[in-house]
Amino acid sequence: MSYNRVNGQPAKLHREQFQPLTFDQADKKADSVLTLMTTDEKISLVGGDRSFFIRPLPRLNLQEVYMSDATQGVHIREKFRDIDLSKYQLEKSTSFPAPISLAATWNPELSYQYAEAVGEECRAGGIGILLGPGTNAYRQSQCGRNFEYFGEDPFLRAQMIKEYVKGVQSTGTVATLKHFVANNTDYYRRRSNSVVDERALHEIYLPAFKAGIDAGAKAVMTSYNLLNGEWCGQSETVINDILRKQLGFRWLVMTDWWSVYDGEKLAKSGQDLEMPLAVALKHADSLIQDGKVEVSDINRMAKSILRTYFSMKFDEMKRDTSYYGNFEDHERTALQTAREGIVLLKNDGNILPITEKSKTILLTGDYVDKLAVGGGSAQVKGYNNRLMIDELKK
């Protein structure tokens, strides 16, 4: 069951908490379906469909699964490159304070409720996989995606992300830890090489991912960058050795969009799903014929997708618009996050020349008359937005 944790209010029951199938239960169901699939069907499954979907297989009664960004709420994307996505979109979605603000609350319980609300909004839109939380370290202030992340401190990130994962997945929505790993800049992000030694990797970059994995995260997205000279999305060192063996991750691994280049390396790396479609694996059948990729490699990839699919009961999932009834709770959670994340400085020594007699205050800057929000795939527009200048005039 899920609870209202804001402001220490009494626990408020919304509905029964989602219970996934165990690894062994899901593995057994995946095996039973895999034996019925043709090689062509397996190849089609390991490449994304229409940019944001796990491909459906109607012959085997497997429905499509829609994915959506991001960490601070649901990005409403009605259309993308002539692909109609309106079937899976919300009438509105709550724009929560950025995760960097959530981290500033130092409140893991609030992280749970924040994420639970995001998960409920995913369910209202029929979204099975949330492409968040952003789990990277805030290493460079120039990184344009820092607002999606939980700061620079490994311990704080780990504590907040652990509860975030639990909150999202309590609703039956998959949480996706991203971007694995050491993805600290978006400048030349497809060519950026993060050179990181073992100690720094394990002390700074991995703890938050490990916490999310231990909390039960069902998906990990690999990153655009190279780690020590290897593209993360097709690196056996990154995926098989670090993610799967060292961190113990056993569920779905997907690429970031258009981030892999070598189908043979991808199939051998431990990667499962190439997004947004099969590019490196476009000619997987030829790679198999040439002996560069084994059918067993494709079987492993397809089985991992199916295992996650069945664990999260996507074969039973339906859009649940009754969650719109919880949006007022979500608004209160967003407000509480903003309140707890604020750092208020006292005006000692009258550093700001404002007194009780002051009648006029100059408010200037780019965001006086518009909202300060992060952009790109993580942007959440929200609704009933209020501008700073309008509030100060009241």
Where are these regions (language model features)?
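Glycoside hydrolase catalytic-domain context in secreted enzymes
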Residues: 2-394
